[in-house]
């Protein structure tokens, strides 16, 4: 870190609390986006795991949006002076249901900020802890640890990491076509302005990727949706995922799963069979 850069470590411990009410319309909209038939969403319906991402949307003023479509650096998240930002992974504990109609408070805390040098230059990792409490409860219904990675700009001589072959032996699998409409709908549902998901000229010419990038949270949601399709009565108590390499809109990709007792291995692979996301869910016994 240079003398002119902010002390990013000073952001550790900062917190904010925001409030939302769990409405039915976002649930119905994501149900349609994931290609399920329309169903009533009555008050009291439990949210499927990860669908809390439809709420607590980032309501930044248009004048506060940066060139990449995210909010300008600073504020709650530290002002990391690196241009590329990606969702690296998350861990979850699902302790109690969150239901349609609930009033929910989300307290977010900067848990850690770490910097290191990688193959492609400097990396900064920011870990955020989210706790969601329903209807003024003392204990959280959901705890999430969210890992964000910031990277330097793409260089012409960057060498991509060696790909990792995806596992075989899937008991469940589903092919996903990540077209522009799917990516747009998910961006709209989560009020995500990040241009890498919908602006092809920006993502290819400015950030140097070959195509639009499929949202990491969308892939994670599709993994747990695969579990729900094949084990609809299963109750997920914990989940973790790690983004291994980007998934682009240029080809279909596949989500896979296999169950071993109360542990479910879930993973996504690209059209060449390379692993793009690895995840594990734990089921209530």
Predicted segments with their positions:
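A contiguous, surface-exposed recognition patch within enzymatic or periplasmic domains that forms
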Residues: 2-46, 163-219, 226-229
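Residue-level preference for alpha-helix termini and adjacent loops
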Residues: 10, 17, 21, 52-55, ...
């Amino acid at each position: 870190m240079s003398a002119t850069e902010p002390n990013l470590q000073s952001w550790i411990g900062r917190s904010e609390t925001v409030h939302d009410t769990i409405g039915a319309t976002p649930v119905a909209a994501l149900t349609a986006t994931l290609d399920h038939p329309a169903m009533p969403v009555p008050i009291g319906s439990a949210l499927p795991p990860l669908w809390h991402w439809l709420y607590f949307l980032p309501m930044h003023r248009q004048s506060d949006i940066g060139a990449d479509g995210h909010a300008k650096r600073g504020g709650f998240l530290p002002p990391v002076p690196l241009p590329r930002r990606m969702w690296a992974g998350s861990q979850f504990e699902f302790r109690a249901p969150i239901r349609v109609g609930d009033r929910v408070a989300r307290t977010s805390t900067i848990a850690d900020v770490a910097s290191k040098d990688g193959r492609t230059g400097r990396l900064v990792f920011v870990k955020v802890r989210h706790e969601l409490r329903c209807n003024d409860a003392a204990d959280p219904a959901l705890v999430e640890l969210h890992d964000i990675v910031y990277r330097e700009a793409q260089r012409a001589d960057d060498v991509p990491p060696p790909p990792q072959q995806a596992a075989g032996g899937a008991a469940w699998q589903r092919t996903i076509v990540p077209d522009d409409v799917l990516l747009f709908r998910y961006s709209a549902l989560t009020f995500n302005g990040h241009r890498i998901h919908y602006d092809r000229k920006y993502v290819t010419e400015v950030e140097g990727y070959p195509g639009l990038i499929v949202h990491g949270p969308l892939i994670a949601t599709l993994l747990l949706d695969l579990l729900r399709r094949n084990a609809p009565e299963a109750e997920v108590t914990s989940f973790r995922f790690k983004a291994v390499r980007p998934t682009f809109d240029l080809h279909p990709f596949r989500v896979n799963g296999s169950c071993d007792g109360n542990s479910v291995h879930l993973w996504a692979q690209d059209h060449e069979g390379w692993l793009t996301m690895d995840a594990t869910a734990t089921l209530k016994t």
